[in-house]
Design a protein with these regions (language model features):
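S-adenosyl-L-methionine-dependent methyltransferase catalytic core, i.e., the SAM/SAH-binding region
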Residues: 1-231
């Protein structure tokens, strides 16, 4: 997010709805969905390596760390091992191929979420540098928020929610109050109710957090300062 606007450079509020969109999920050619056959791409744009290229070349331990750190997937070691074993004799080129491999690492009983959900999220987040981009977006928004301005973030993944929470609280817990940017912060996350989920099932994982900007001078907050040491 780069500023284009008046010389005052102040905004009363920002709303971030982060992550992949329904249009991207519903297009099998983008490779984001584990429920539709498509090329294993997962890139937000056409730059950089695809998910298929990443999976083909990454070391098993690195893949396990990636799935665990970016997806909070407890079975990451088993999944990584299964993927590496499969790719010895086969290329993994499609979304359903990867989803089937991941699914085979779980018991036959099914859960509320598809077994491949966290693995797909982890690969997508890593591939598109989404955590780094989110941190940059939070910093940019905080820089241009006016005193009393609201910053509202809707996230869909625990690692994103943790980053947002740590950003809003930064300076309060470590007593570096001069760098704390928000004087009012709703600590309790807001989630969709049953009626909202019935209307839009994809909202079931949504979490809304918001905070109100104080008068302190902006100072950029690094990802490592928020407790993130990612692969």
């Amino acid at each position: 997010m780069l500023w284009r606007g008046s010389k005052k450079k102040e905004v009363n509020g920002f709303v971030f709805d982060i992550g992949v969109s329904s249009m991207q999920l519903d297009n099998p050619d983008r490779g984001f969905s584990f429920q539709k056959e498509g090329s294993l791409d997962m890139r937000m744009d056409s730059k950089g390596k695809t998910a298929a290229e990443l999976i083909e070349n990454i070391q098993e331990n690195e893949l396990a760390d990636l799935i665990y750190n970016y997806g909070d997937e407890r079975n990451s070691r088993r999944i990584a091992k299964k993927i590496v074993e499969y790719r010895k004799n086969n290329k993994i080129n499609t979304t359903l191929e990867l989803a089937t491999i991941v699914k085979s690492c779980f018991p036959s009983k099914y859960y509320k979420k598809h077994p491949a959900t966290k693995t797909f999220q982890a690969i997508r987040i890593y591939l598109n540098n989404e955590i780094e981009e989110l941190c940059a977006g939070l910093n940019n928004a905080s820089q241009y928020l006016s005193k009393g301005g609201r910053l509202c973030i809707v996230s869909f993944h625990s690692i994103e929610d943790r980053l947002i929470k740590n950003f809003f609280q930064f300076g309060k817990d470590n007593l570096d109050l001069e760098r704390n940017l928000f004087y009012k912060y709703r600590n309790k996350v807001i989630k969709p109710n049953n009626k909202e989920i019935e209307i839009n099932p994809r909202s079931r994982s949504a979490k809304l957090r918001f905070a109100i900007r104080n008068e302190r001078e902006f100072s950029s907050i690094k990802l490592t300062e928020l407790g993130f040491e990612l692969v």
